[in-house]
């Protein structure tokens, strides 16, 4: 049996591998715990999270993403809305939100919802772009039309600088224990160029009003990947060189990343 398309794409990914490393590197213990994943997209993160143990429920906004995730991991995949988390108060031991909150127009009420379904003392993990204006990577995004004010990536905002993320979580009942960043300039720059190339190709055959939640910047189904089959073969052939380009980030370890992860626990007295 051929490998699922999500895993095929992951094998040739750049930023996704860094995201997965950051996610699994900061994931709290999950064995024997009930865990909620928000922002499962097409199920790639769900696949790896479930390998870590625990019982996972995974959610996303997009119907097509939910359908793809179900094909990959089969069960406990739920389509949600943008205003509430449809579970009982204190239902989960762990809540993980993966590059998800920046898409929510009214983010603070949604944070309260995420905290509500977490048990007191439960573990919380948030991943998001940092969205720091004035940096070279941000200037590249603006040039390519990927900033939030240009409706890039379907974002309601460009992201959360670590201090802003910490403040948002703490005023809603999460005691933040730490933050970290990942994905430095060379990886971010190349990922944006690849997203732009895919976006241009996708939009030539699709009405812009039919764009999906992620703004059509990467394949979000097996059918979408098949439609760019020749281009993907070229990309695969160039992948070793592209991967080598991203390794330049190791030469500038003092340069902070463009993505962030924050983790903490729900206060015992939080609602």
Each language-model region and where it sits:
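Conserved N-terminal segment of class I S-adenosyl-L-methionine
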Residues: 1-88, 94-98, 238-244, 254-261, ...
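Residues lining the SAM
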Residues: 98-101, 127
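Short N-terminal helix/helix-N-cap motif within the alpha/beta-hydrolase-1
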Residues: 105-109, 136
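A short glycine-rich, Lys/Arg-flanked "PGG" loop and its adjoining helix->strand segment in the class I
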Residues: 108-123
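Conserved class I S-adenosyl-L-methionine
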Residues: 125-147
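A C-terminal cap/extension of S-adenosyl-L-methionine-dependent methyltransferases
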Residues: 139-145, 181-271
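Acceptor-substrate binding/catalytic loop of class I
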Residues: 147-164, 182-184
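A SAM-dependent methyltransferase catalytic signature shared across enzymes that methylate proteins
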Residues: 163-180, 229, 237
């Amino acid at each position: 049996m051929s490998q699922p398309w999500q895993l095929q794409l992951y094998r040739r990914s750049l930023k996704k591998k860094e995201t997965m490393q950051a996610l699994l590197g900061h994931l709290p213990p999950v064995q024997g715990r009930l865990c909620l994943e928000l922002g499962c997209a097409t199920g790639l993160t769900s696949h790896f999270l479930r390998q870590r143990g625990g019982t996972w429920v995974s959610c996303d906004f997009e119907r097509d993403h939910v359908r793809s995730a179900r094909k990959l991991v089969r069960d406990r995949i739920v389509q949600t809305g943008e205003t509430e988390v449809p579970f009982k108060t204190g239902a989960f031991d762990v809540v993980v939100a993966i590059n998800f909150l920046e898409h929510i127009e009214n983010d603070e009420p949604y944070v309260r919802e995420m905290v509500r379904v977490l048990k007191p003392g439960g573990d919380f993990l948030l991943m998001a772009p940092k969205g720091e204006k004035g940096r070279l990577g941000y200037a590249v995004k603006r040039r390519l039309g990927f900033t939030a004010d240009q409706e890039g990536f379907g974002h309601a905002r460009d992201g959360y600088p670590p201090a802003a993320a910490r403040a948002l979580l703490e005023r809603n009942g999460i005691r933040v224990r730490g933050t970290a960043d990942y994905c430095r300039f060379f990886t971010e720059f190349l990922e944006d160029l690849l997203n732009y190339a895919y976006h241009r190709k996708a939009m030539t055959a699709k009405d812009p009003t039919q764009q999906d939640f992620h703004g059509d910047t990467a394949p979000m189904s097996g059918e979408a990947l098949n439609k760019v089959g020749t281009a993907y073969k070229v990309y695969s052939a160039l992948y070793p060189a592209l991967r080598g380009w991203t390794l330049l980030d190791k030469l500038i370890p003092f340069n902070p990343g463009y993505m962030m992860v924050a983790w903490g626990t729900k206060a015992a007295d939080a609602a």
